[in-house]
Amino acid sequence: MAQPPSATTIPQVGDTSPRPSETSDDVSTLKPAAQASWKKKHGLHLGRSNSNHSNNSAKHEINRTASPKRTKTFWKSFKYLLDLTPKQVDDFMASYVIYSLDWADEEQMVKTLGPDYKAKVGDCLQAYYGVLNHLCALGDVEKMYIPPLMDKKSSVLDNQMLYEESIAQDIGLKPGDRVLDLGCGRGRVAAHMAAVTGAVVTGLNIDPNQIAQAREFTEQMGLQNSFTIQDMNELPLPFEDNSFDAFYQIQALSLCKDLPKLFNELRRVLKPGAKISLLDWVSLPAYDATNPEHAELMRRTKPLIGAVGTPTPETFEKALKDAGFAILKSDNASIDGLQAPLIDKADVYFRSLRQVILGLVKVHLLPPHFKTLINRLCLDGQAFVKMDTMRLVTTSYRIIAQKQ
């Protein structure tokens, strides 16, 4: 396998959105009933009945059947990071070069990575996620995404679980359904989806390290989910026509070089009438690439969230429609269209962790590469907060569509 580029420059330390969020209304329906609706319909024991939902003012429930065991997960990832080789650290740092590029600028891609740039991007993604997934597991972003803000009083992890349950509701999952998860990470979202609905998830991811963890976790949970190592830019997908009842992905599609080609392939493997859920990074109408402040914020934010492309909502909508999907919902899934409170929570936690790690490195209780890793991880979190509060970008843009 080709290696990530050996040298790169690592970056140093009024709503203009066209569509309002529906989330505040969604949550009033979802939060007591996200699990209870499946219990009522399918006999799954996931919480209290929703028979008195309309006048129920009790504390909202969140299904934790497949929630990560945080202490065990933390120490397992900590040990993995402790044992990293110098080459793994170097490859991880070098992999950030792809986030200074964009699929839309092929000339710069070729100039930086060479004519086989698509394969080089794939190699960089493996080097990047092979380390990043363990860094993220040191906090509440083991699933490697900042969720939409579904509940202002809840944690990052609880908002993740609320959003995942809303996906199941949006795409109508029921027991026995086969669901495709693109960019499945460690399989934690897939486990939660299966536990809540009784569906069976097939996950795809480019990183063998994460796939191995997903399989181990699924076996521990006693679930039937399965996982395949696959680069979404290497098509066709390894599935028969009309194989899946539904599809979802969370913040993976900026890594896709050819959205129309991928969506056509998804249409092939989905059954007629299947619904899909996309949650992704988009640039919003307020973003102006010619504005120096906007451009600098974008330069700092893309590496933080791991984005190669910078699609717009319209980019996704057109590609979906051209592939034969009808758009059912297209909006910002966060309350008030802002993720900043959750982004800031994660940033504050990891910056606090950074101080602990730097102290331990200083007294030689941790190896020096921990300083390199945590400094890179904590770089520019506030740039992301600022872009979100200025409504220039979001990673909580939601599209629900249906195969025609």
Model-derived features with residue positions:
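A short acidic, Gly/Pro-enriched loop at the edge of an enzyme's catalytic core
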Residues: L235-F247
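Conserved SAM-binding strand-loop segment of SAM-dependent methyltransferases
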Residues: G222-L235
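Conserved SAM-binding loop
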Residues: A214-R215
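N-terminal auxiliary segments of SAM/dcSAM-dependent transferases
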Residues: H60-L138
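A short glycine-rich, Lys/Arg-flanked "PGG" loop and its adjoining helix->strand segment in the class I
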Residues: P260-K275
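Substrate-binding/catalytic lobe of Class I Rossmann-like enzymes that use SAM or dcSAM, i.e.
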Residues: T290-N291, E296-S396, Q404
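Class I SAM-dependent transferase core
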Residues: M109-Y117, D123-L173
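Conserved SAM-binding loop of SAM-dependent methyltransferases across substrates and taxa
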Residues: R186-T197
